């Protein structure tokens, strides 16, 4: 009897359609419930929910009740959700994004991320996303790396207990700013199963040496969350689609061919002044790009104000 050769895990099967979402950090001037309703009415299938002052603030009273209400609203609207943790001035009214995992007082950031994990678990989030932070000038690189690994290990343990998937985002200008940096951190943590990568498509064009579709292919096996926006080489500025340098149909094709089933969420945090218009324009663009990539496109949006009605 011939012994069959050992098998290796198969690549995830390709998908025929992608699920588009939108970041609530691009709806900063809307109440959260209003933002969710607008996005569902437009035809989005999910949201990247940034925990912020007016959007499910994890430090305000009645968190459990508010999380439960949002979970029910998401279900009623048919929206998937990922939790984002990049709010500005949430932890410190004087310093944007401080403290990070690299600061002397990193405990405040760790506490926030543990709260985000609990919120993500209660919402049934597909992922909780976070980043390293910018290294403070007085902190040596090796000390910053040690702090990052230690802080991430604590968050990984919390996520593992809660059954939550983490998406770590390389961010230009931060200690971990590219895919190579994510790979280093993943190895340093012992390659935990719950620690995936959040890939911002614009960042790939901004600073990666590979093409954007190749970046997608490089991380396909670890990809748990996707942010999408246009960008130009060497400039970290989130742009509306069609105003940067990215050719999107090959990017969407690479996501589908890699078997990615998570949300592909528009990331335009500086466009809240025209949020509904920009969100509508963005979805039209993505649907057109998906068709050009040979992918199926979701049903057209229902008339405004009717989503979730009895």
Task: Annotate each PLM feature.
Residues 143, 156, 171-173:
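Short helix-to-loop capping/linker segments positioned immediately adjacent to catalytic or ligand/cofactor-binding
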